[in-house]
From Swiss-Prot:
Protein name: Ig delta chain C region membrane-bound form
One Pfam entry name: C1-set
Tissue specificity remark: Cell lines producing IgD contain several mRNA species for Ig delta chains. In plasmacytomas, the secreted form is the major component, and the membrane-bound form is a minor component. In spleen, however, the membrane-bound form is the major component. These two forms differ in their C-terminal segments.
Other noteworthy facts: The sequence of residues 1-237 is assumed to be identical with that of the secreted form.
Organism: Mus musculus
GO CC aspect terms: plasma membrane
Region described as Disordered: spans on this chain: 89-111
Chain ranges on the Cytoplasmic side, renumbered to this chain: 280-290
Length: 290
């Protein structure tokens, strides 16, 4: 008999304002071709589908939706329609507090980072003019139970103003095709700046050879160009679990995995997938365009 597919729901850990949009993700891994959907289908829901792909004997598919926070409710359900119907309803992460009236839930619990968060809001409160991006990272997405998911890279950038920004990916020898990656719309962060991310699907499976992929960020308003690269060698993986919120197959509650390196202490970054593995040889260079 075919094994029943595994199903994982993802949610932003940071609670949205009522007038904001929130990203939800549904990751399904199974031994047969899959057809999944988010329900209910409404005009206010924006979908992005990463097509089903087979790796190591399993089919993997990711469906991301962007929903208005004011319309978010427990009726949102990720459904496998093929080969056999299976459902998993969205559930508010425990880090959200329904006591708040202005938010769907309050801000994420910053734990030891409350001082840094307050400082960021204070020092950047009244921003005049352009602000150059200050944080740029590239990480590989993978899980210990499903190594086939190691075919994704995540690029995150934050601290810029205004919000207009351009992200692209460079491969080993050339620019990556736009069909291989998706970039989120910039969202506001404390202090009046913005942040965004881009996810790249690698065209081939990782091997023992060393390949380098680069995320290039161009912020025209501040005349700034950043790039961050990741050299991938499967033997060089160092597991570092970053902060994310995921509801797995065996549980009805979210796991809140705290980011070890504290790159973005004032927020919980939503990623298209869920467990980030930090590979060696990552570096960031800053180029100021005159």
């Amino acid at each position: 008999d075919k094994k029943e597919p595994d199903m994982f729901l993802l949610s932003e850990c940071k609670a949205p304002e009522e007038n904001e949009k929130i990203n939800l993700g549904c990751l399904v891994i199974g031994s047969q071709p899959l057809k999944i959907s988010w329900e209910p289908k409404k005009s206010s829901i924006v979908e992005h589908v990463f097509p089903s792909e087979m790796r190591n004997g399993n089919y993997t598919m990711v469906l991301q939706v962007t929903v208005l926070a004011s319309e978010l409710n427990l009726n949102h359900t990720c459904t496998i329609n093929k080969p056999k119907r299976k459902e998993k309803p969205f559930k508010f992460p425990e880090s959200w507090d329904s006591q708040s009236s202005k938010r769907v839930t309050p801000t994420l619990q910053a734990k030891n980072h409350s001082t840094e968060a307050t400082k960021a809001i204070t020092t950047k409160k009244d921003i005049e003019g352009a602000m150059a991006p200050s944080n740029l990272t590239v990480n590989i997405l993978t899980t210990s139970t499903h190594p086939e998911m190691s075919s994704w890279l995540l690029c995150e950038v934050s601290g810029f103003f205004p919000e207009n920004i351009h992200l692209m990916w460079l491969g080993v020898h050339s620019k990556m095709k736009s069909t291989n990656f998706v970039t989120a719309n910039p969202t506001a962060q404390p202090g009046g700046t913005f942040q965004t991310w881009s996810v790249l699907r690698l065209p081939v499976a990782l091997s023992s050879s060393l390949d380098t992929y680069t995320c290039v960020v161009e912020h025209e308003a501040s005349k700034t160009k950043l790039n961050a690269s990741k050299s991938l060698a499967i033997s060089g993986i160092v597991n570092t679990i970053q902060h994310s919120c995921i509801m797995d197959e065996q549980s009805d509650s979210y796991m809140d995995l705290e980011e070890e390196n504290g790159l973005w202490p004032t927020m919980c970054t939503f990623v298209a997938l869920f467990l980030l593995t930090l590979l060696y040889s990552g570096f960031v260079t800053f180029i100021k365009v005159k």
